[in-house]
Amino acid sequence: MSRKPADVASKERNEYIPAFISKKPFYIDDDDTANDYLEHQRLHKQTTDQSKWYERGKRAGPAATKYRKGACENCGAMTHKAKECLSRPRKHGAKWTGKDIQADEVIQNVDLGWDAKRDRWNGYDAAEYRQVVEEYEELERLKRQAKLTKGETQTTNDGLDDEAPEQEARYAEESDMGRQQSTATRNLRIREDTAKYLLNLDLDSAKYDPKTRRMVDMGAAEDQAAALVAEENFVRSSGDAAEFERAQRYAWEAQERGTQKIHLQANPTSGEITRKKELAESEAKRDAHRKALLEKYGGEQHLKHTPLLETMVVENERFVEYDETGAIKGAPKKATKSKYPEDILTNNHKSVWGSWWHNFQWGYACCFSTVKNSYCTGEEGKRAFEEARNMLLLPGDETEQPSLAVESASRQEEPSAESHNQQRDSKKRTLMEVQSGITEEELESYKRSRLAADDPMAAFIEKDDS
C-alpha cells in the first residue's frame, strides 16, 4: 500500500531529521495531509508581516468642516477624546469655535507574529540616523576650522589630510592591540610577570599548590614571599611601587590626551622630569590661587592649627568591644543623670518638689505643702500644718507632747552640748535617721499620743473621760 503524496510544499525530505521523528507511528491517522506535525522544524520563508509597523502621523482623508458629536473637544478629531489629545491645548476648543478641525487618525491593527514581536529593529526608521551623521560632520568641520585658526596653511593642512589614515592606523594599534593579537599571544606571560613559586626558593618558605594555584602554609612571619602575596592576583605594594604606578598612569594619560608621547620604559628619566615639573606648576598655581582668595576675602586665622582638631573623632582601626547594654567594656562608668530637670525652684519655694514626705504624700520641705506647683507659704504653711495636725491629738497630750516638727526645728536651732558630743562620737547614722531624721523612740511616742480620726473608740474614750 503506497503512501499519499504530500500536499504541503515544505515537506521535502530532510536528511538531518532521524527516521523515528520523520515517520509517523502506525497508530496515527494519515488522512489529514495538510496537518504537518513537523512544521516547527521546517525552514519557513520570510513573510512581509515581520516588517509591518504603525504608520506614524497618518490621517484619514480630509478634515471635517463641522464639529461632530463625540469628537475631541480640543482638536475635533473623532479617534480620541480630549484627555488623550496630543495637540496643543487651545483656549477655546474646536467644540465651541468650530475652526481648525483636525483630520481623524488612522487606527491601524498591526498583528505581529512570533518573530516580529521579538525583532528589536522592527519599526526602526533608518532616516533617523541621519542627524547623528550630520552631528559628526559638524564636529569634523569645527576641528578643521580650529586647525586653520592656529595658523596652519592650506598646504600643511593637505599634508595632514594625507597622513590622517596613517595616524588613525597607528592610534588603533596603540589603543586596541588586544583585538589584533591572536588568542595564543594574549595568553603568553610577559617578562615582568613572576610566578608565585619563584618568589622565594627556600624549602621552608610558603608552599605553592599547583592544583588550586594558591599559596598554602604561609610560613614564618619573616617570610617575605608570604607577606607579598596576600591573596589571589594581589601583590602588596611596598617601597616605590606606588610612585611607579603614579608615573605609569601619568604617561598613559598624557599619551591619551595627545599632548606629548611619554614612554616610561623607553625613557623613564624624561617622563619623571615632566611629571615632577607639571606637579610643581600645578602646586604653585594652587598656592597662588589660594593666596589671592585669602587676600581678597581674608580668613587666614581659621586655617591655622587649633587644639580642637586633635579632639576630633576620626576613623581609626582601634578595636572596641561592647557589652550587652551597649556600653564600651573597660570604660569608666559615669554617674547617670536624670532625664528630669533638677534643682529648679518654682513659685518662691526654697526647696524642690519631693523634698518632704508625710502620710504617703510628697511635698515641699519649705512650707509642708503637698500640692504640686503651688505657691510657697513659708513659715505660715508650716504653722498651719502643725495646727491641723494638733487637732487630732488628745487635749491632755497637747502640752505634754510638743509637735514633732517644732521639736525637730528647736533641736536643729539649739543643739545641746550632749547631742553635740553624741554626734561627734557616732560617725555613722542609722537608716531611719538618714531617711527622715526621726529616731525610733520619737516615732513610738508620736504613735501613742496621736489620735486616729477613723478610730471608732476615740469618741467612746472621750465620753468616759468627761
Swiss-Prot record:
Residues 147-186, 395-450 are annotated as: Disordered. It is found in: Nucleus. A zinc finger (CCHC-type) spans 70-87. One of its GO terms (molecular function) is pre-mRNA 3'-splice site binding. Keywords: Metal-binding, mRNA processing, mRNA splicing, Nucleus, Spliceosome, Zinc, Zinc-finger. The keyword Zinc applies. It holds the Pfam family Slu7. One of its GO terms (cellular component) is spliceosomal complex. Disulfide bonds: none annotated. Its main location: nucleus. InterPro entries: Slu7_dom, Splicing_factor_SLU7. GO terms for biological process: mRNA splicing, via spliceosome; RNA splicing. Associated with the spliceosome. Involved in pre-mRNA splicing. This is Pre-mRNA-splicing factor slu7. It comes from Emericella nidulans (strain FGSC A4 / ATCC 38163 / CBS 112.46 / NRRL 194 / M139) (Aspergillus nidulans). The lineage of its organism: Eukaryota, Fungi, Dikarya, Ascomycota, Pezizomycotina.
